[in-house]
Amino acid sequence: MTADAPVISGSSVVKLARGVRLHEDPVRGQTVLLAPERAMAVDDIAVAIVQALDGERNLDRIAADFAEKFDAPVEEIAEDVRTFVQELSVRRMLEIVQ
């Protein structure tokens, strides 16, 4: 984590920054998160997290929704969601709403 990156917690409400979007790359057969002058390959789990970042629900709510949907421990999912979102924050691909 860099000094410039805000701390992400379960109460954080975030959405993708302007100009950042998911893109299917048919040539490589993978999904990438595109931002101005940079890209990040993402797997199916990351795609699900990115799609859930609606700027309305906090990360704890998103994790609880995933835990219910996938019948998995909420604590484990919450940690994975926060870690991935922190990485997006460091890469300046997010906007913190609250």
Swiss-Prot record:
Q: Name one GO biological process term.
A: pyrroloquinoline quinone biosynthetic process
State whether keyword Zinc-finger applies: no
One GO MF annotation is: quinone binding
What UniProt keywords are attached to this protein's entry?
Plasmid, PQQ biosynthesis
Q: In which pathway does it act?
A: Cofactor biosynthesis; pyrroloquinoline quinone biosynthesis
Q: How does it assemble?
A: Monomer. Interacts with PqqE.
Q: Which family does it belong to?
A: Belongs to the PqqD family.
| Role description | Functions as a PqqA binding protein and presents PqqA to PqqE, in the pyrroloquinoline quinone (PQQ) biosynthetic pathway.
What's the protein called, per UniProt? PqqA binding protein
Which organism is this protein's natural source?
Answer: Rhizobium meliloti (strain 1021) (Ensifer meliloti)
The record's gene field reads: pqqD
